[in-house]
């Protein structure tokens, strides 16, 4: 056989042998992967739990290793309450990580409520223990910190699970969530504070998209119904100050709190509020008294009412559920 033809024949035989070896090894590789698992297979399995609302399954694969008070919302109840959960579009083939052959990286392309984002998982090869599906373990799961604070909103709930909110933007409380679109409900408001629920989008915590929520800050507003209670309490206090016997109360003007006073009449009582502040202080129209102490005097007073708040800025109420309000009067 000529040298050229012999060379071509040898090349052909080599190629055929290579293909034959590849086909021969395929069952071996398949068996190894079945026994040991694959990095991308572990990522797919983990993401399937999150997509299906199975927080317990995801936690069984990767635990965040944090105190219980920070992981209150990593439950099936909360994850299934999400109005939208992740959809897995693709999972890449594994590539070597920084730790050499025993570390791999897998990038997943995900979609949440129409917004697409990617997340890269780091995995490492470990000894396979009983119950493990793979020798490959995800280092860090998809746990996202959400800082929560509130003005006049001491607590909040998601999916029936409640927790405390921080008192201000400078001191929020952080909680972990799995990816999803959640509704945060304000709690602990009482009858005289209004606050809106807020929609919170949790992706992967990178905040690469403006769609993802960076923090939650509730804003509780004093209810307008407080104005009616302020007028009611102010009128009651003014009538008490215009009545002999109760005119000696500390909230009454000093001019009326004299043993020389023999008669008092309330000539004018405020009908409206002139101003209101966020701290629960209200200014009312002036009131006018006429009193006698040997001679007749007209007394015009400035009327101010203050709603008593607890430490969270929530109006305190009495046994009947009415707000506690103090009224002061000063001579004009």
Predicted feature residues:
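Terminal targeting segments of Actinobacterial cell-envelope proteins
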Residues: 1-8
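Hydrophobic membrane-insertion alpha-helices, especially the h-region
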Residues: 10-30
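Core segments of small alpha/beta cavity-forming domains
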Residues: 31-78, 153, 221-260
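Short solvent-exposed beta->alpha transition segments
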Residues: 55-115, 249-276
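Exposed beta-sheet edge and beta->alpha loop/turn motif
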Residues: 94-167, 171-174, 283-332
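A short, solvent-exposed beta-strand micro-motif common in secreted/extracellular proteins
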Residues: 174-191
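Structured interaction patches on ligand/partner-binding surfaces of diverse proteins
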Residues: 189-224, 311-312
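Membrane-lipid interaction segments
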Residues: 224, 228, 232-332
